[in-house]
Amino acid sequence: MGEYIMEKNTIILGIETSCDETAVAVVKNGTEIIANVVASQIESHKRFGGVVPEIASRHHVEEITVVLEEALKEANITFDDIDAIAVTEGPGLVGALLIGVNAAKAVAFAHDIPLVGVHHIAGHIYANRLVKEVQFPLLSLVVSGGHTELVYMKEHGSFEVIGETRDDAAGEAYDKVARTLSMPYPGGPHIDRLAHEGKPTIDLPRAWLEPDSYDFSFSGLKSAVINTVHNAKQRGIEIAPEDLAASFQESVIDVLVTKASRAADAYNVKQVLLAGGVAANKGLRARLETEFAQKENVELIIPPLSLCTDNAAMIAAAGTIAYEQGKRATLALNANPGLDIEA
């Protein structure tokens, strides 16, 4: 599983439509971005306070061809130059995933190009390989709107989830707390910005769970924030939103960083990779850097902001490994919203 032979200049076309970004990228050898085009739908979903699946799907239908053409143009290549097409098959919104999967199958069929299905979270993890070559064993802290997990990898293409959220993902908690503070969607960047202006003076819970557990839980924290705001309103007390944001963020980051640090020691890893949309959080990035600066034998890799949020370069990067390992999808490939990374 771990061994693969790198052919000379493998060109992979990546397609990502799992949520509210329509993205197509071209990546060389799994490490070099030739083109990376992303059409975001944030403006369309803002007024609803979250992603509306039906609207997301319609946007993907409108954008996919344009984004695909733009990526090929930016990379200055034709379909003849592509070794394989890598597409997100799951997890995600089923309607949104279908647009990308069907586009990938159509291109693969029309131009007789091999097809590879990619797990969305594997993509987030492999975004780090576009920054630096990964070394095994490694640990990835995946923090996004739908996922919060610690993934152990002993070799390429091998994923073991050693910790995951038991309820809300961290990104989900961020969005719900932002809504409580009347901030626009997506809430994460707004909370992060506000947190830097405040002080963590409000006592909020941290869910450590069992002593040896690497799992996460954020629903209690989210409820505590909502209750704090509600109780203050009832008593006519003014709570500084920046202090509440700072207190909430510190609670989330404390648990994420402590558990990642403990797992890195226990599994004796060479690298720790940050992955997922919440990886763009400045507070989290800073705390991880401080924590891992103290560990001599562990290298921390944090991708640039552009590779934290959903993009297709990461899907192409993960797809390169799958392609080189001989994995192929047939034209029966389907969207799988509940796809398991360990499968």
Swiss-Prot record:
Localisation: Cytoplasm
GO annotation, biological process: tRNA threonylcarbamoyladenosine modification
Pfam families: TsaD
Binding site for substrate: 142-146, 175, 188, 192, 281
Gene3D superfamilies assigned: 3.30.420.40
Needed co-factor(s): Fe(2+)
UniProt keyword annotation of Glycoprotein present: no
GO molecular function annotations of the record: iron ion binding; N(6)-L-threonylcarbamoyladenine synthase activity
Cofactor note: Binds 1 Fe(2+) ion per subunit.
Record keywords, A-Z: Acyltransferase, Cytoplasm, Iron, Metal-binding, Transferase, tRNA processing
Gene Ontology terms: cellular component: cytoplasm
Catalytic activity: L-threonylcarbamoyladenylate + adenosine(37) in tRNA = N(6)-L-threonylcarbamoyladenosine(37) in tRNA + AMP + H(+)
Enzyme Commission (EC) number: 2.3.1.234
PROSITE patterns xref list: GLYCOPROTEASE
Binding site for Fe cation: 120, 124, 310
Role: Required for the formation of a threonylcarbamoyl group on adenosine at position 37 (t(6)A37) in tRNAs that read codons beginning with adenine. Is involved in the transfer of the threonylcarbamoyl moiety of threonylcarbamoyl-AMP (TC-AMP) to the N6 group of A37, together with TsaE and TsaB. TsaD likely plays a direct catalytic role in this reaction.
Membership in a protein family: Belongs to the KAE1 / TsaD family.
Descriptive protein name: tRNA N6-adenosine threonylcarbamoyltransferase
Source organism phylogeny: Bacteria, Bacillati, Bacillota, Bacilli, Bacillales
